[in-house]
């Protein structure tokens, strides 16, 4: 199994914790799934902590420090603030897989919006009260399929 690593020269907008966490992850040869199981989080949420896009709880910091053998004080210092979300990827993205996700929204965004509005009314799907997961399916022909589930609380627009 290949593991996700980080080339900091390609990601200058990431926080210092990203380099610390990815270096330890590579040294331990852990997948995000393994780390997530240890800290009790979803693997996408765990990866988001590594990329500075999610806030680590004090318990997350303790568990990450223990598992990855990083001094807890270092992680407390690097992960104690609030994430500066949205700065890690230039728009439009250049990385092919991230661009495909962007392209899905470009191609199907209005279709998603229309169907969601018909089902729920005028509003938006929250990215705050939100969860996501990634699964792998293999069909009868042996083809692998990526299944990405997005689950967000529906927030109706208020009338004023």
Swiss-Prot record:
GO molecular function of the protein, one example?
DNA binding
Please give the positions of the paired cysteines in each disulfide bond: none
Q: What is its EC number?
A: 4.2.1.104
Question: What keywords is this UniProt entry annotated with?
Answer: Lyase
Q: Mind telling me which InterPro entries this protein's record contains?
A: Cyanase, Cyanate_lyase_C, Cyanate_lyase_C_sf, Lambda_DNA-bd_dom_sf
Biological process GO terms, please? cyanate metabolic process
Among CDD domains, the record links this protein to: Cyanase_C
Residues of the active site are 100, 103, 126
State the similarity comment.
Answer: Belongs to the cyanase family.
Q: What is this protein's function?
A: Catalyzes the reaction of cyanate with bicarbonate to produce ammonia and carbon dioxide.
Question: What protein is this chain from?
Answer: Cyanate hydratase
């Amino acid at each position: 199994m290949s593991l996700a690593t980080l080339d900091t020269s390609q990601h200058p907008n990431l926080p210092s914790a990203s380099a610390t966490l990815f270096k330890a992850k590579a040294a331990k040869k852990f997948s995000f799934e393994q780390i997530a199981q240890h800290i009790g989080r979803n693997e996408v949420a765990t990866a988001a902590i590594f990329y500075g896009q999610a806030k680590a709880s004090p318990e997350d910091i303790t568990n990450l420090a223990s598992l990855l053998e990083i001094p807890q004080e270092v992680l407390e210092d690097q992960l104690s603030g609030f994430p500066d979300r949205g700065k890690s990827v230039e728009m439009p993205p250049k990385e092919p897989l991230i661009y495909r996700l962007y392209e899905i929204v470009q191609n199907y965004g209005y279709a998603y919006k229309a169907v969601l509005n018909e089902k729920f009314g005028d509003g938006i799907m929250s990215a705050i009260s939100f969860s996501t997961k990634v699964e792998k399916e293999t069909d009868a022909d042996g083809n692998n399929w990526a299944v990405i589930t997005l689950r967000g609380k529906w927030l109706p627009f208020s009338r004023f």
